[in-house]
């Protein structure tokens, strides 16, 4: 039994679709959203994405990361299968780690207009160096803007606790 009306699921086309088309080039249009039924409260939604891959824009070598996406929804939420396919579309996309995290965040802001969002990539080392770009956003003029500033300043106070290596 569902509490969702069929009209609330109209934009959700990928979930349950047995003929899924896996895209190998960056494809922001694959992202889908659905209405948040709980706009009266703040709550976090967190996605752990341990199989993210992209390509180095200079060498074409693959980069691997675990990406953490956390957000406080407003009116819309991202549908998880569409997010999976969207992240998969970075497989042959050549960009620096920092660019990938900002692109992902910007696309999700455009899709959902969340109250708050953060995207953190923990990339596996290449050449003995790991890169962990963190980016966030809080809706301007709201308490979430202040929250974003606070979390930015405090997001990685204890780097020795990072254990994805």
UniProtKB/Swiss-Prot annotation:
Disulfide bonds: none
Entry's EC annotation: 1.7.1.13
Amino acids binding Mg(2+): 163, 165
Compartment(s) of residence: Cytoplasm
Activity regulation (UniProt): Activity is strongly inhibited by Cu(2+) and Fe(3+).
SUPFAM superfamilies, per database record: Tetrahydrobiopterin biosynthesis enzymes-like
GO cellular component: a single term: cytosol
Signal peptide residues on this chain, from the entry's feature table: none
Keyword presence, Transferase: no
Swiss-Prot/TrEMBL catalytic activity: 7-aminomethyl-7-carbaguanine + 2 NADP(+) = 7-cyano-7-deazaguanine + 2 NADPH + 3 H(+)
Active site: 56 (thioimide intermediate), 63 (proton donor)
InterPro entries from the UniProt entry: GTP-CH-I_C/QueF, NADPH_dep_7-cyano-7-deazaG_red, QueF, QueF_type1
Keywords: Calcium, Cytoplasm, Magnesium, Metal-binding, NADP, Oxidoreductase, Queuosine biosynthesis
Binding site for substrate: 78-80, 97-98
pH-dependence annotation: Optimum pH is 7.5.
Domain of life: Bacteria
Transmembrane domains' residue ranges: none
Pathway(s) of this molecule: tRNA modification; tRNA-queuosine biosynthesis
Any Gene Ontology biological process: tRNA modification
Pfam family, one: QueF
EC class name: oxidoreductase
Task of the protein: Catalyzes the NADPH-dependent reduction of 7-cyano-7-deazaguanine (preQ0) to 7-aminomethyl-7-deazaguanine (preQ1), a late step in the queuosine pathway.
NCBIfam families: QueF-II
HAMAP family on file: QueF_type1
Name of the molecule in the record: NADPH-dependent 7-cyano-7-deazaguanine reductase
Native species: Bacillus subtilis (strain 168)
């Amino acid at each position: 039994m569902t509490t969702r009306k069929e009209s609330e699921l109209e934009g959700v086309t990928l979930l349950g679709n047995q003929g899924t088309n896996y895209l190998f080039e960056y494809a922001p249009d694959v992202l889908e959203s659905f209405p948040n039924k709980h706009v009266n409260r703040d709550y976090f939604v967190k996605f752990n994405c341990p199989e993210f891959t992209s390509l180095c824009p200079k060498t074409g070598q693959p980069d691997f990361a675990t990406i953490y996406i956390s957000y406080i929804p407003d009116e819309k939420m991202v549908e998880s299968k569409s997010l999976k396919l969207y992240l998969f579309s970075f497989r042959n996309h050549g960009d620096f780690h920092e660019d990938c995290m900002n692109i992902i965040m910007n696309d999700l802001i455009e899709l959902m207009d969340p109250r708050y969002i953060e995207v953190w990539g923990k990339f596996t080392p290449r050449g003995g160096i790991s890169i962990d770009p963190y980016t966030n956003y809080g809706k301007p003029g709201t308490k979430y803007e202040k929250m974003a500033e606070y979390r930015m300043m405090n997001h990685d106070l204890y780097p020795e606790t990072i254990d994805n290596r």
